[in-house]
Each structure stands twice: as C-alpha cells, then as structure tokens.
Amino acid sequence: MANPLYQKHIISINDLSRDDLNLVLATAAKLKANPQPELLKHKVIASCFFEASTRTRLSFETSMHRLGASVVGFSDSANTSLGKKGETLADTISVISTYVDAIVMRHPQEGAARLATEFSGQVPVLNAGDGSNQHPTQTLLDLFTIQETQGRLDNLHIAMVGDLKYGRTVHSLTQALAKFSGNRFYFIAPDALAMPQYILDMLDEKGMAWSLHGSIEEVMADVDILYMTRVQKERLDPSEYANVKAQFVLRASDLNGARENMKVLHPLPRIDEITTDVDKTPHAWYFQQAGNGIFARQALLALVLNSELSL
C-alpha cells in the first residue's frame, strides 16, 4: 500500500502527523515480530555523523544492515573535506546526495539538518539530532517503548526530569505526545535548565495540562512514565555544570510508592542521574528502550525508502 512518508525528509517530530506516528509505530511492531533482512537490499544509505554518537549511530547502522542496505559515511567530520579543507555543509550534502538513496545526519548546529534538505535534491534527509533542537528518531523509539509498556499513547501522566532546556529528546517527545489526547506533563528541572517557554506555550495552545515541580518525590505516585535526562556537560560552562549536575538523582528508594507499571526511561548515556540500584527494579526500562531504537529506525527507513510497503 502507498505510504505518505515515501521520500519524505524527517527533520522534526512536527514533520509527522499523529497518523504518521501511528504508521511508524505499527511498522516497527511488525518488523520486531517479523524481521525483513532484504527489504532495503539494493539501497545505499549515508550515515553522516558530524557529532559524537554511540547509540544513535550504531542503532541506525544496525537497522540499515538488518534490512539489507549498504552503508557509507563517517562518524567524525574531522577527517572529511568539510573538517580538513573547509568545504561547506551545502557542498558536502550536494555531493553525498549523488551517491545514496537517503542521508542520516547528526550535526552539532541547530538547523543543520533542515539546511541539508535544501541541497539533497530528491534524497530524503533523516535528522539524527541537530544541536539542542530536535531528535525525532529518539522520539519514535520513546513512543514505541511507551506504547509497548503502557498499551496506549493518550491519557498518560509523564514526568520529565533534569536538563529540559538543552535536552532535544524532551522537546521532541513533548511535541509528539501533545498530538495525542489527555496527556499530562510534569516538568522537574533546575531553574537554569527549565523547559523552554515555546514548549509550554505549545502545550497551552493544545489545552494540555502541565506543571513545574522541584523534586521527583512530588510526582512519583502520579506518573506512568518517568523520563530522566542527563545534564549535558558539553552544552554548559564548567561552573554551571558543577552546580546542577547532581540536583536531580533517581535512586531505587525513590521508587517506593510508584505505580506498579510505571517505567523509568532515559535516552542515555546516563552519568549520575540514575543510580545503578535502579537497574534491578521492574521500573527500569531504559536498556529495553535503547533496544527498541533498532525497530523504530528500521520502520522509518523502510517507509521513507519504499513507495509501497506490505509487511
């Protein structure tokens, strides 16, 4: 059947409607249950990481290989013409797009992925993270995990903790969950790392309930999902980082009184914000969440690169 995501750029979670999200998640579930090792057999995909990454890059490249695609690219722009010779991003993308069927791209500069779409011709660009702006494929695996564990994506109580200012994952996830009905958000962060006002304004416009809190304890008994984030050292000056890094830490003892099916998620890497004793509790779900990245990214690649898809 024809699908609306064929050859579509995926730069922001706002590029996907609620129906699009449901299509990706349904496709991910099918691929998890029934692997398709030759679905992208004759496709070549560029994996272009201008910024360091472990999970996102390996998850994307594993997804490509498991669907049968060929993979080219780099994990460090320092050894490319852009890094060594001063080639522009526009020229880099213009050239790469002549070689491949799709470009997966991470870049430290906000807006870089959107800029790349202006020079990629008919080749779709998938944003694997652009600065502190957007991380749509992380959001897809987050949604897939929430749906798997809670059985729904509406009427949920979701707490987001830590670096809500620079954490692109929480920006994208909040925007995505706002497409569904009845969700309530609890934001727990230091004042210096509070959720951006444009996100709060968006929730107000959609009539979504939200509130600000000073501790995890305040909301523990009320939430279905506790979404932890690390304080991003690379985006703060050293003195600011030292002041806030340990302000919100989750320990196993903090989970007393949590709902039985409440799950703790984290986009990883974690530093000190979740102690290892949490790993042994039934609430810890961040490693399963990371594993779901394979299926969410496989689904997106399959849909973007196939005009018709029947699984």
Curated annotation (Swiss-Prot):
Transferase listed as a keyword: yes
Molecular function (Gene Ontology), one example: amino acid binding
InterPro entries hit by this protein: Asp/Orn_carbamoyltranf_P-bd (IPR006132), Asp/Orn_carbamoylTrfase (IPR006130), Asp/Orn_carbamoylTrfase_sf (IPR036901), Asp_carbamoyltransf (IPR002082), Asp_carbamoyltransf_Asp/Orn-bd (IPR006131)
PROSITE patterns named in the record: CARBAMOYLTRANSFERASE (PS00097)
Keywords for the protein's UniProt record, in alphabetical order: Pyrimidine biosynthesis, Transferase
Annotated EC: 2.1.3.2
Positions contributing to carbamoyl phosphate binding: R55, T56, R106, H135, Q138, L268, P269
Positions with a binding annotation for L-aspartate: K85, R168, R230
Gene3D superfamilies membership: Aspartate/ornithine carbamoyltransferase (3.40.50.1370)
EC class (word): transferase
Coiled coil: none
SUPFAM superfamilies documented for this protein: Aspartate/ornithine carbamoyltransferase (SSF53671)
Stored Pfam families: OTCace, OTCace_N
Record-level GO BP terms: 'de novo' pyrimidine nucleobase biosynthetic process; 'de novo' UMP biosynthetic process; glutamine metabolic process
Pathway(s) the chain acts in: Pyrimidine metabolism; UMP biosynthesis via de novo pathway; (S)-dihydroorotate from bicarbonate: step 2/3
GO cellular component, one term: cytoplasm
UniProt family annotation: Belongs to the aspartate/ornithine carbamoyltransferase superfamily. ATCase family.
Role: Catalyzes the condensation of carbamoyl phosphate and aspartate to form carbamoyl aspartate and inorganic phosphate, the committed step in the de novo pyrimidine nucleotide biosynthesis pathway.
Subunit note: Heterododecamer (2C3:3R2) of six catalytic PyrB chains organized as two trimers (C3), and six regulatory PyrI chains organized as three dimers (R2).
Name of this protein: Aspartate carbamoyltransferase catalytic subunit
Organism of origin: Salmonella typhimurium (strain LT2 / SGSC1412 / ATCC 700720)
Gene of this entry: pyrB
